[in-house]
Swiss-Prot record:
Mn(2+) 2 binds at residues 14, 39, 250. It catalyses: a ribonucleoside 3',5'-bisphosphate + H2O = a ribonucleoside 5'-phosphate + phosphate. Gene3D superfamilies: 1.10.150.650, Metal-dependent hydrolases (3.20.20.140). SUPFAM superfamilies: PHP domain-like. This is 3',5'-nucleoside bisphosphate phosphatase. GO terms for molecular function: 3',5'-nucleotide bisphosphate phosphatase activity; 5'-3' DNA exonuclease activity; 5'-3' RNA exonuclease activity; manganese ion binding; nucleotide binding. Binds 3 Mn(2+) ions per subunit. GO terms for biological process: dephosphorylation. The keyword Phosphoprotein does not apply. Mn(2+) 1 binds at residues 7, 9, 64, 248. Signal peptide: none annotated. Keywords: Hydrolase, Manganese, Metal-binding, Nucleotide-binding. InterPro entries: 35NBP, PHP_dom, PHP_domain, Pol/His_phosphatase_N, Pol/histidinol_Pase-like.
């Protein structure tokens, strides 16, 4: 299977590269199809699509929606969306409006733990205050020398129970899937191997996702081991879900796979991009 990367990020959300830069970086691997999926926003899609067209690379409009499901935060990728669809645009805006207040609370929590200046420091890494995230705090903490690398900063400060973690109510699973499908796209559970869930809880998530109208699961992910990939291929097959593939690239040197670099899906999988042919933006001949 040719490289197909349907999950990566730009500076429009919490990536380190502009939409053009991240497409140019992916182009070095001669991908067959790309989709930019910034968190809770679609502002980088036009630039990314234009960059892909210049490079002769087929492109899908995408987004990654933050969801609260029970006590868990999960992410739902939307592929082949119309970013101008009013319900999707309004829903994403409602999510973004809560990010800045959460960031202020994170900064105050870190200051109470003895690390001052984190909110202002994180803002310097963020082009759009509406999109400030844990990743921007993490980059500040690494850059300031407080922590040696991104993996350590999340483990030490930015996960549940740690000083810089602030819980937040994101979109419901039903709303997120509804916005995506209503905008002409297909909804995909992103990087399921990252969630702190056992088999029973993952099964429940999949069933709730399908009941909401979800259609796919990210089998090949920069967050997944080969064992994870084969496990979620079996989940996809058992539940009749399409399989997707994405690097979840954010920045050079921050771990995981580089943009445009994905594993082949196991043979039992039904690739989701075959169902999205009509939504693919293809370079002019």
């Amino acid at each position: 299977m040719a490289n197909i990367d349907l999950h990566f990020h730009s500076r429009t959300s919490d990536g380190a590269l502009t939409p053009t830069e991240v497409i140019d970086r992916a182009a070095a691997r001669a991908p067959a199809l790309l989709a930019l999926t910034d968190h809770d926003c679609t502002g980088g899609l036009a630039e990314a699509a234009a960059a892909a067209a210049r490079r002769g690379i087929p492109f899908l409009n995408g987004v990654e929606v933050s969801v609260s499901w029970g006590r868990h935060t999960v992410h739902i990728v939307g592929l082949g969306i119309d970013p101008a669809e009013p319900a999707l645009a309004a829903g994403l805006k409602s999510i973004r409006e809560g990010r800045l207040e959460r960031a202020r609370q994170m900064g105050a929590s870190l200051e109470a733990a003895g690390i001052a200046g984190c909110f202002d420091g994180a803002m310097r890494w963020c082009d759009n205050p509406e999109m400030i995230s844990r990743t921007h705090f993490a980059r500040h903490l690494v850059d300031s020398g407080a922590v040696k690398d991104m993996r350590t900063v999340f483990r030490k400060y930015l996960t549940p129970g740690k000083p810089g973690y602030v819980s937040h109510q994101w979109a419901s699973l039903e709303d997120a899937v509804g916005w995506i499908v209503g905008a002409g796209g297909m909804a995909v559970i992103a990087h399921p191997g990252r969630y702190d869930m056992g088999r029973t809880l993952i099964e429940r998530l999949i069933l709730d996702f399908q009941a909401a109208g979800g259609q796919g699961i990210e089998v090949a992910s920069g967050s997944h081991s080969l064992d994870d990939m084969h496990k979620f291929a079996l989940h996809a097959d058992r539940h009749g879900l399409y399989a997707s593939s994405g690097s979840d690239f954010h920045a050079p040197g921050e771990g995981g796979r580089d943009v445009g670099h994905t594993e082949d899906l196991p043979p039992i999988c039904r690739p989701i991009w075959r169902e999205l042919e009509a939504r693919i933006l293809r370079p002019a001949d």
